[in-house]
Design a protein with these regions (language model features):
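C-terminal motif of bacterial Sec signal peptides marking the signal peptidase cleavage site
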Residues: 28-32
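Bacterial N-terminal signal peptides that target proteins for export
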Residues: 2-21
Length: 282
């Protein structure tokens, strides 16, 4: 009988020990899960904003080795949607928010110019706003109509949902539609590469992404420079936004605060962007 009682006591102790271990492990897992949002974040959206966000993230992670920031593209609309569905913590947008998106928290991180680019072999240096609209509406179809050599104009445009396309449509096209004959690309880099490879192509990209293998055109005889964007003489400019579903917290807030800090703004200025008014106020 005594042996049976001892065995029962031993079993109860074992069960108690196992329960304590399980509880400890469970608490540890809960703690780890609750800490995950603090140490990792996903940022998705505009391919115009993406390269600058990558520069900011690289610097932030160098200063804060425990942080993990994953930057993804997809376009402005995709980034905003990802924020709404919580598949991304922060959305990147290079267009203004639509009415049904304005409930989202957002902040301007910088301003950017939009430029028309052609191949360096193209002799054209300047186009008017009307000429650009007519090119993209396919009313003007040959470079000879603009003083260039007789060659068909190959029109390169961004995809629907792109903030770059949205800004171009609003600022240049107005009520006109971009021709369905345009070659559609899903990133600034892809547009730039096609123009670099084709002497008869024209495209539009972010000012900060212009490289030596393409030529930026003057618009209405005004050069696309940071100074001309700031003084308003060059009118093709837009906001770069970070968007979150509600007031940002944890790592999201820390990264956004870093972006708007003097150090973050300096990084963006060095890359050719115009500092944010939000950042200037800090």
């Amino acid at each position: 009988m005594r042996k049976k009682i001892v065995t029962c006591k031993l079993l109860r102790r074992i069960r108690g020990t196992i329960s304590a271990v399980i509880l400890t492990l469970s608490m540890g897992m809960l703690t780890a899960c609750s800490q995950a949002p603090e140490s990792a974040t996903i940022i998705a959206g505009s391919t115009s904003v993406q390269p600058y966000a990558e520069i900011l993230a690289e610097e932030y992670m160098a200063l804060n080795p425990e942080a993990v920031i994953d930057i993804q593209g997809g376009g402005s609309s995709a980034g905003i949607t990802a924020t709404q569905t919580h598949s991304a913590n922060i959305g990147m947008s290079s267009r203004a928010l639509k009415d049904d998106e304005k409930k989202l928290w957002n902040v301007e991180i910088a301003k950017d110019g939009l430029v028309l680019i052609v191949n360096p072999k193209n002799p054209i240096q300047n186009l008017t706003s009307d000429q650009i609209r007519d090119i993209y509406a396919a009313t003007i179809t040959d470079w000879s109509q603009l003083g260039g050599t007789k060659s068909k104009i190959n029109i390169i445009a961004r995809e629907e949902g792109s903030g770059t396309r949205s800004a171009f449509t609003e600022l240049i096209m107005g009520e006109e539609e971009i021709t369905p004959k345009a070659i559609v690309q899903d990133s600034n880099g892809a547009v730039r590469q096609l123009v670099a490879d084709d002497p008869n192509a024209i495209g539009f990209i972010s000012l900060g992404l212009v490289t030596d293998d393409v030529k930026a055109l003057h618009l209405d005889s005004i050069e696309a420079t940071r100074e001309n964007i700031m003084n308003g003489s060059y009118r093709l400019s837009r906001q770069f936004l970070f968007v979150t579903d509600g007031e940002p917290i944890g790592l999201d807030k820390k990264f956004i605060d870093f972006t708007l800090s003097s150090e973050g703004q300096r990084l963006l200025i060095n890359e050719g962007l115009i500092p944010s008014e939000e950042g200037a106020e800090k």
